[in-house]
Amino acid sequence: MEPKWWPNQPVLEVKIEGNITDREQAFGITKQMVDDIESSKYSHVIVILDLTALGQSPSGAALLAGNLPQTYKIEHLVMINAPGLFKVATMPLFHLRNKLHYVGSQSEANKKANDLLPKLRN
């Protein structure tokens, strides 16, 4: 996982690399992401989650979505190349309903985040 904050903006980009084979590994990745968010100075954030590398592993994407620790700081979650199984696995995340955005490229994700920034509650 490669987390990177946008300079002076409440936007965290996270690129998932490699394979996810079990719940513990998935939870470890998402916990690190949530810990970065919780320790930030921002009340609410936009997360750009690049799942391109998991395209070959829909079960890994589902494990990742199903093991996302709860945080109320994620205002919008923009996912790049999310497999269909990931979309199904995020359905129980009621606190993110209408805040999940699916895009096909980094440029689309950047545009979406820039469009959402003025609406962010901070």
What are these regions (language model features)?
Residues M1-N122:
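Amphipathic, Lys/Arg-enriched alpha-helical "gate/interface" segment within cytosolic domains
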